[in-house]
Amino acid sequence: MKVNFFRQESGTEPVRSWLKSLSPLERRLIGQDIKTVQWGWPLGMPLVRRLGGSLWEIRTVLPGKIARVVFCTRDDRIILLHGFIKKTQKAPKKDIALAKQRMRRL
């Protein structure tokens, strides 16, 4: 499968920007997990979890924190919709809502 970043009308790619804000180690760990999903799709827990419908999350354990990259699949593409550092037990509703909003705009 091919991996694409969600692109806003302005041309910005929020997940790419978010990844660039992280440390090199964090980017590498998240990138490895994205590549694992790309080449091994479909995958399940503990790396990938379905959030509902066609929305999924990649779950990456980083030093001292946990990252999530929310994505959907279209045809033979994985589209990275939103990325965030998880601070609570459940995924924040606002982050899931934002990913769903972006998915509807595809």
List each language-model region with its residue ranges:
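Basic, Lys/Arg-enriched alpha-helical interface segments
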Residues: 1-66, 74-78, 85-106
